[in-house]
Amino acid sequence: MNEAVREDMSSNYDLAKTEADKIDAQIVETLKSGHSFRVEAGAGSGKTYSLNRVIEWIQANKWSDYSRKKQNVVCITYTNAAVDVIAERLAKDSFILPSTIHSFAWNAIKQYQKFLIDTVTTNDEYRADDGDFNQVMEVTYTLGHRYKENGIQYLYHDDVLKLFCALLDNTKFRRVFANKYPLILIDEYQDTYKPIIDRFIGHFIEKETGPQF
């Protein structure tokens, strides 16, 4: 590689980094304002880099506030591998929770056992092929296979998302949810289960209430 090519590549990198830093600064200012925002860019444009910069800023500037209130910032990403990458950058006791959408949805709804039991036992959509709804005492989600065993109804992956949507339509649940998760970051939001995104927009973003996204 000759010197001219090397200098040209270095110049392009510097320009790209300067532009990325400007965008990151704009994102931070939006975070400070409390308004929700969306970052749209093509593959390889640095969205993941920006996400990591935002996470670093939140961890450095919001620790005392969110930790004192026992609140969590959630970073929803598409794969478990991406969750692991983000987790490696966080302090062990961080209030930032990287998660897939399925894990996040289940953590948000799992304590509402009465609602879950009532819903799955009155709706054939959740019936396991090898069981019935008699004497369901608990609803849980582990490997994503739907079956019933020893009074426990195990949910399919999409069951969790649908039940989360149903609870998001409940006003009381939304109040509790918003208080627990004041900020939700969604990586690759266009690949996230659309009914959930629609509810985030309709119940929170359009009404300018609840979590910041």
Where in this protein do the model-derived segments appear?
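Conserved RecA-like helicase ATPase core segment
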Residues: 57, 202-213
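Accessory N-terminal region flanking or inserted into the helicase ATPase core
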Residues: 1-45, 50, 115-188, 193-200, ...
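Short helix-terminating capping/connector loops at secondary-structure junctions
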Residues: 65-71, 178-179, 208-212
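Short acidic/histidine-centered micro-motifs embedded in hydrophobic/aromatic stretches
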Residues: 104, 180, 203
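P-loop NTPase Walker
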Residues: 1-114
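Structural motif corresponding to the C-terminal cap of alpha-helices
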Residues: 59-63, 168-172, 204
